[in-house]
Amino acid sequence: MTAHEQISAAIRAAAGEGRTALVAFITAGYPDKARFRETLAEVAGAADVVEIGVPFTDPMADGLTIQRASRGAIAQGVTLRWILDELAAMAPPPAAPVVLMSYLNPLLALGYERLAERAIESGVAGFIVPDLPLDESGPLDAALAARGLALIHLVSPVTPPARLEAAGRASRGFLYAVNVTGITGGAKAAGADLNEYLGRVVAASRVPVCAGFGVRSAAQVADLGRVVPGVIVGSALVESLERGESPAAFLGGLATP
């Protein structure tokens, strides 16, 4: 099974158990760089997939919480290379598939071929690149696909139908359905409009769909889980870590029966 297939399988396994898969986002090295491996291990033990944010100086898709986390991680010296080194050194490796969410510049600086090689060495299963347009993703996609790694595309309520279909065909691992039109951590779309949008995304995708941006409660997870197999939790988990709470306990409180 390739790395991107492992991501899809983890999400489908949750559905097979009658629950909504949780994709848990943390910013690497935040709030405490020294406890990164410990935090990651605990999160991976409670989530189905872990999304690790690579800190960036201009995180344009992120809300205040993740911007703050990104600044805090950068202040502690966290870089893409440091993250890959830490992941490679983890023993045992995380219990759930790991994907990196990174803006494009750090990936370009490392180089796509070297990035893909380092990902394999570090146990990274795939990447989410929010500022990489689908029609410009070919070179990165080729480097990742050659090694069985995921390139996870994002769609939103304003994605045109043709682009939605293209993203549904191209995405590996899962398809990221942004359920707000703004930045992370904001209020989600509601009711029939949200369900109609997510239904269109599911129909267009050949891989599992995970909905994210603005998910903060077990009720939201349950509501979204009626339409999509997976839900992404980011800002709320980062804020829980800032409060010194157990990430496993927080994620357990969001889990569906």
Task: Go through each PLM region and give its residues.
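Conserved, mostly hydrophobic/aromatic
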Residues: 24, 43, 50-53, 119, ...
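Hydrophobic faces of well-ordered beta-strands that scaffold small-molecule active sites
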Residues: 22-26, 50-52, 98-102, 127-129, ...
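Glycine-rich beta-to-alpha transition loops that act as phosphate-gripper elements at the mouths
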Residues: 27-32, 101-109, 133-134, 154-159, ...
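N-terminal glycine-rich anion-binding loops that anchor highly charged ligand groups
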Residues: 14-21, 45-60
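Glycine-rich phosphate-binding active-site loops on the catalytic face of alpha/beta enzymes
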Residues: 49-58, 122-128, 132-136, 176-185, ...
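A structural motif corresponding to the C-terminal end of an alpha-helix
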Residues: 17, 46, 83-98, 122, ...
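Catalytic cores of alpha/beta
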Residues: 33-44, 159-169, 204, 211, ...
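Active-site-adjacent beta->alpha loops and helix N-cap segments on the catalytic face
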Residues: 2-14, 33-34, 56-68, 75-90, ...
